């Protein structure tokens, strides 16, 4: 009587491994990995073959340098894993990225009078990953800075993933005197000196 030995290697399965999402908007540093088990492993250093559908067609259990759609802020990648018997399993995994980090600056309180230092500016931040840090050109470290005089102010924002954005603004001050009226009287005759100009102004503050 002949005998047949049947090896039961277990069900061939592929599960998700570690995921590293993209750190900053439009970077390409995402990572995905899969873990395969069962089936009929290849003999040697590689038990299974892998094929990712990224633009490089990576062929290892971990795909690196992955980009994400800039509109939806996520992208699915498929990995096809094959064992020595030709059995295949496909796993679809998602990589996400934060919205673009952006900052602008608003004047919450303009300088009230020429030569004073009572202006206020506020940095308005969207996107990125909380929390934010603020670095102003005048040494400020919060979203709002005050006691400001005439000049250019620059703020740099950094989020939890060390993504950065900057914004620069010129803070003006009122003029010291506002000209209301200019009176002109022309010289009556050649050689005379009876013409004059009179300027009427108002001190603003």
Which positions does each model-derived feature cover?
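Solvent-exposed loop segments of extracellular immunoglobulin-like
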Residues: 38-51, 127-135, 203-205
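A short beta-strand segment in extracellular, disulfide-stabilized domains
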Residues: 28-38, 117-126, 193-201
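Conserved structural position at the C-terminal beta-strand
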Residues: 81-83, 157-159
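Solvent-exposed segments in extracellular or luminal domains encompassing
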Residues: 61-78, 143-154
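Short beta-strand segments within Ig-like beta-sandwich modules, predominantly Fibronectin type-III
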Residues: 53-59, 135-141, 147
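Short, solvent-exposed loop/edge segments of extracellular or virion-exposed proteins
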Residues: 15-26, 104-115, 180-191
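Extracellular interdomain linker/stem segments of modular secreted and single-pass surface proteins
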Residues: 7-14, 22, 96-103, 172-179, ...
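Coil residues (strongly favoring Ser/Thr
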Residues: 3, 32, 70, 84, ...
